[in-house]
Amino acid sequence: MILEDTDLPLSHEQPSYSQIKDVLDKIPTGEHLWDLPKYEEKIILNWLIKLLATNLEWITVEEERDYLVSTICERIAERSGRLAAPTRKREFSLSNGVSVVLREPTMTYNTLGFKTWGSAPLLSANLPKWEDLSNSINALELGAGTGLVGISAAIQLGWQVVCTDLPDIVENMQYNVDYNSELIQQYAGSVSCHVLDWMNPPDDDNRPSWLIKPFQRIIASDCIYETHFGELAIALFRKYLAKDGIVITEYPLRETHLEEIGVFEKGMDAAGFERQMGEEIGEEDFGSLYPVTCRWSRWKYHG
């Protein structure tokens, strides 16, 4: 059993090429793909995705890094169904009876945001339950990915939404916004797409025009899969949220990410946020192994 023989190296410890390769070599593939019991397969797949999300930036030898990235993508592709599917368009039905269409390109090692993850459709469905129709609400979405939540907020609630992510993700997000632009305008909403790197946000003296005004809502869906992501998100909330604003989060309670989620939630408490919360069942894109409990929260600042 791989988990009895090997401790999976943690990404935040920046494991070496040989450490990662040793584990990859032991992961069943080909005709032995499903030799692992379900609980081990779940842990392995989460480890692969989490490792991939780091871009393996600490592996400085390009050939070694390329090999690891390629192998990780192959292992994920074998296990992931739609995750590794070629570029296609998906249709999502909203609570007001409208359907939006999103393009999802094939995922690569640095483009996890090309897929619409399990908590995003749930959060899109929840927004009209919590919020009234108002085209005066300005909202910032962090890690917006395909743009589903931001687009749905504009169409269902008439919000003025700024969707942000990394450069490679924003290009596809903009395509999705343009594709659904007539619906967005029909419901008096708006969506703009911009690059926002959590690790390198603009200095206060050099904020772009779209970041100058505080946001009444900040949305983050399925963004807590590294400990430092939670810390960075909290810093952005405090930086860009209006005094009377609300932070809206939802994320799957994946077994391998409970520590990161715990750090994030304690950090929000320590930063002076109080919340309403609940849990519901969502579906990951990994087949029948992956129905998952998702936790939503509406955070208000009381610092």
Swiss-Prot record:
<dbReference type="GO" id="GO:0005634">
    <property type="term" value="C:nucleus"/>
</dbReference>
<dbReference type="GO" id="GO:0016279">
    <property type="term" value="F:protein-lysine N-methyltransferase activity"/>
</dbReference>
<dbReference type="Pfam" id="PF10294">
    <property type="entry name" value="Methyltransf_16"/>
</dbReference>
<feature type="binding site">
    <location>
        <position position="117"/>
    </location>
    <ligand>
        <name>S-adenosyl-L-methionine</name>
    </ligand>
</feature>
<feature type="binding site">
    <location>
        <position position="198"/>
    </location>
    <ligand>
        <name>S-adenosyl-L-methionine</name>
    </ligand>
</feature>
<feature type="binding site">
    <location>
        <position position="221"/>
    </location>
    <ligand>
        <name>S-adenosyl-L-methionine</name>
    </ligand>
</feature>
<dbReference type="InterPro" id="IPR029063">
    <property type="entry name" value="SAM-dependent_MTases_sf"/>
</dbReference>
<dbReference type="GO" id="GO:0005829">
    <property type="term" value="C:cytosol"/>
</dbReference>
<keyword id="KW-0808">Transferase</keyword>
<feature type="binding site">
    <location>
        <position position="165"/>
    </location>
    <ligand>
        <name>S-adenosyl-L-methionine</name>
    </ligand>
</feature>
<comment type="similarity">
    <text>Belongs to the class I-like SAM-binding methyltransferase superfamily. METTL21 family.</text>
</comment>
<keyword id="KW-0489">Methyltransferase</keyword>
<dbReference type="GO" id="GO:0008276">
    <property type="term" value="F:protein methyltransferase activity"/>
</dbReference>
<keyword id="KW-0949">S-adenosyl-L-methionine</keyword>
<feature type="binding site">
    <location>
        <begin position="143"/>
        <end position="145"/>
    </location>
    <ligand>
        <name>S-adenosyl-L-methionine</name>
    </ligand>
</feature>
<dbReference type="GO" id="GO:2000765">
    <property type="term" value="P:regulation of cytoplasmic translation"/>
</dbReference>
<keyword id="KW-0963">Cytoplasm</keyword>
<comment type="function">
    <text>S-adenosyl-L-methionine-dependent protein-lysine N-methyltransferase that methylates elongation factor 2 and elongation factor 3A.</text>
</comment>
<keyword id="KW-0539">Nucleus</keyword>
<dbReference type="GO" id="GO:0032259">
    <property type="term" value="P:methylation"/>
</dbReference>
<dbReference type="InterPro" id="IPR019410">
    <property type="entry name" value="Methyltransf_16"/>
</dbReference>
<protein>
    <recommendedName>
        <fullName>Protein-lysine N-methyltransferase rrg1</fullName>
        <ecNumber>2.1.1.-</ecNumber>
    </recommendedName>
</protein>
